[in-house]
Amino acid sequence: MAACPIARTAMYHGLEDQLSQTTTVEVQVDVPDSADARWCVEQYYRELAERFDTGFDPVKSNPAPDEDLVPPRGYFVVARLDGHPVGCGVLKRKNPTTGEIKRMWTASSARRRGVARKVLHTLETLAREAGFTVLHLETNRTLAEAQAMYRKEGYIEVDAFNDEPYAHHWFEKHLQSNSSR
C-alpha cells in the first residue's frame, strides 16, 4: 500500500532536512568589498530593518568601515554552504587587547545548522591569533536567538560600552589562549 501524498511529502521534507544538516559549512576570511561579503551585509541590513521595531538605518549605526575590516585592523568572514554565502561576521580591533564582533548574520534558509556558531568560533580564533584577550559585542532586544547563543558561548552581559543606538544588550567574553582551551 502506497503512502498517502501528505505522508510522502512529510517524509521527503524530513529526508531533505537530514541531508541539509550534513552539508559542510565553510567559514573563511574574505575582503569586505567582495560580492559575497556585500551580499551578506545587504541581507543583514534588510533583515534588521524588518525585525527591529524602530527599523534600521546603517547610517545611524556605529560604523565599521571597510578599512577597519582587513588585517591587521580587523577581519570579515563569510560562511558558505555548498559554495553559496549564507552568513557573515566581523572582528574589529578596538585596542591592542580588545576586539569587537559585529555584523553577525545567518540567512534564514541556513539557520539551525550551526552556521552562526561556526562564524563566532572562527572570529574568536582570529581574535586569539591577533592577541586579543577580550571580545565585545552588542545586540538588539528583538534578536533573542543571538542573545541565547552568545550566553551559551560564554559571553556575559555587561554595561554599555558604546553608544550604538540599536543596541539593548552588551556582551563581553574573556578569551583563553588556544593552549589552555
Predicted regions and their residues:
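Acetyl-CoA-dependent GNAT
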Residues: 22-102, 107, 120-121, 126, ...
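Conserved GNAT acetyl-CoA-binding A-motif
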Residues: 120, 126-139
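Conserved phosphate-binding and hydrolysis motifs of nucleotide-dependent enzymes
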Residues: 83, 87, 114-116, 131, ...
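Loop/helix-junction capping segments adjacent to catalytic residues or to phosphate/diphosphate-binding pockets
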Residues: 35, 113, 144
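Short coil/turn segments at alpha/beta junctions that flank glycine-rich nucleotide-binding fingerprints
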Residues: 97, 113, 129-133
